[in-house]
Regions:
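Cytoplasmic-side transmembrane-helix entry/capping segments in multi-pass membrane proteins
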Residues: 31-37, 80-88, 111, 137-144
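C-terminal ends of transmembrane helices
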Residues: 17-28, 66-77, 124-133, 185-191
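Small-residue-rich segments of transmembrane alpha-helices in multi-pass membrane proteins
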Residues: 37-48, 86-97, 141-154, 203
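Conserved small/polar residues in nucleotide/adenosyl-binding loops
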Residues: 201-207
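Active-site rim beta-loop-alpha module in soluble metabolic enzymes
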Residues: 125-161
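Helix-coil boundary and interhelical linker segments in multi-pass alpha-helical membrane proteins
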Residues: 1-5, 45-56, 96-109, 156-169
Length: 209
């Protein structure tokens, strides 16, 4: 049984490598199915190794799978909206997991400082990209940007409360997600091209259980 559960992370590693190689080669016939398959395999790996699996983490990963599926057609506004909404709901699930599993005991000054830094970043990034984003998608894009910042801040605060490597990995995952979606936004709305970034948050958050 112990050997059997390693099938999932090994499969995930192989799948991730194949996906990255297909992105590098521009092979959409391989990139698209491997992208959609990533999150279910992450969920299986999480369930196999987590001491106390959380339904919220599993739900977040499955919403991520839906997001990946819809964003196979990112240049179509309807699918972009559905994909972004799916990821948004996934992040809500992650937030529920964070605030029901982590203890946060930090001075309010830290909360204000960290939040102010992220708020300033949102103002700068959104003000620069706003004109490139279709008007109908601007509210959703802003809400999603704020959600990514809330997720990142929500991972910093437990880390400041008590250091743990799992928290650090999850924080880096959220940071990769911010960077990945920044590239996605630039390619979609500025360069008008289909992006191929990988969602690292989904690969790192499950390490926390």
């Amino acid at each position: 049984m112990i050997v059997l559960k390693w099938v999932f992370p090994v499969s995930l590693a192989v799948l991730a490598i194949v996906h990255l190689v297909s992105c590098w080669r521009g092979d959409d016939d391989l990139r698209k199915p491997t992208k959609v398959a990533l999150m279910p395999v992450v969920a299986l790996s999480y369930l196999a190794f987590a001491r106390q699996p959380s339904i919220w983490v599993v739900a977040g990963l499955l919403f991520g799978c839906l997001g990946d599926l819809f964003l196979l057609w990112p240049l179509k506004k309807k699918f972009f909206a559905l994909g972004t909404s799916s990821f948004f709901l996934g992040h809500v699930c992650y937030l529920i997991f964070i605030y029901t599993h982590y203890v946060i005991r930090v001075s309010w000054i830290w909360i204000v400082v960290v939040s102010a830094i992220y708020a300033a970043g949102v103002v700068v990034v959104y003000s620069r990209s706003r004109k490139s984003i279709p008007r109908a998608l601007r509210p959703l894009s802003l809400m999603y940007m704020l959600m990514l910042c809330v997720l990142s801040v929500s991972l910093i605060l437990p880390l400041l409360t008590a250091f743990w490597w799992g928290k650090l990995v999850a924080f880096f995952g959220a940071t990769f997600f911010l960077a990945s979606d920044g590239v996605l936004c630039d390619m979609l709305f500025v360069k008008k091209a289909e992006p191929t970034p990988v969602s690292y948050t989904h690969l790192t958050l499950p390490t926390n259980s």
